[in-house]
Amino acid sequence: MTLLAGFDAGQTHTRCRLSLVKNGLLQPVGEGEGPGVSHLDAPLGEERFLKAIRTSAQHALKNHPTGLIQAAVVGASGIEHGTGLQQRAEALVGQALAIGDGSRLGKVLVTGDERTALRGAIPEGAGILAISGTGMIVLGRGEDGHEHRCGGWGWLLDGAGSAFDLGHQGLQLTLRMADGRLPDHPLRLQIWNQMGCDSHAAVKARVVQNDFGTADFAALAPLVVEAASQGCSGAEEIVQRSAVTLSNCIDAVARRLSLLSPLVVCQGGAITHLMGFRTAVQQTMRQSIPGARWGDAKGDACDGALLMAQDLTVRPS
């Protein structure tokens, strides 16, 4: 059995979906999950990447032990398209999938997970995918097939427009309340209680612990958005600033690709579950891109990876 493999390799877990191609259409036949990946240059980065690809593929192949993977595409967090990092990752995929008879894949592509997500969400034609979860990135495709990205540089460099940004700014707001720069508000205790803190000193100590990271900041975002909806002026300003940043990224992609009335698909917990934040983004966009059309994703990142793998099989070697 000849199969295509599509991977969605994130920081928390990796999914592999296998598919047959019948009459030009993809027919999924298996799915497996493995651990997450990190940047290849991070400590144990290559080892984690190998384990993620190998484990998820093995689980997906459990009901197809004789299956041969003809082509594989991986959308991975931290991979920059067109770099040496991409080439290293592709070599690792070939190594990870040297299964069964030990043969190596001839057709492999590793790219950023935002690109497989865009292909899955908008398989054909022009459109923009805005991802706002723990992090944020916007990627669009023009009428000519050209793609342009905005944001996605990581929280250390550019985390605005994300749940991390909302939570991080919210925590900073509570410290300004605590030291008297701003009037106190119930949001302060709500955030501190969620963090397990009872004082500003405890907050300061908590954020430097090894087990406190971007996801923990992001987990504070719902409290900030809820406080904004109840009239907390500081929280309202945070939500508005973050919404403007995300909207500006969407606008920048639309302008770069000359899209006057783009289809915009949103993914990620911040933009899909935090309604106050989503509404703020939509209101801002109505001013900057009045012709924008909001739509639903046709598929997920694994679907996008499989479509790209199918492209590899018809592309001349």
Q: Residues of each region from the PLM?
A:
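Glycine/charged-rich beta-loop-alpha catalytic/anionic-binding loops adjacent to active sites
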Residues: 94-103, 146-154, 284-293
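Glycine-rich phosphate-binding loop of actin/hexokinase-like ATP-binding domains
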Residues: 125-177, 181
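Short, active-site-adjacent cap segments at secondary-structure transitions
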Residues: 80-82, 116-118, 137-138, 271-274
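Short beta-strand-loop/turn "lid" adjacent to the catalytic site in phosphate-handling enzymes
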Residues: 38, 57-96, 100, 109-110, ...
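Short glycine-rich anion-binding loops that position phosphate/pyrophosphate groups of nucleotides
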Residues: 12, 78-79, 134-137
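A short glycine/serine-rich beta->alpha loop
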Residues: 39-40, 78-80, 152-160, 291-296
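Active-site neighborhood for divalent-cation/phosphate handling
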Residues: 99-129, 140-148
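ATP-binding/phosphotransfer module of carbohydrate and carboxylate kinases, centering on a glycine-rich
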Residues: 1-69, 120-128, 173-317
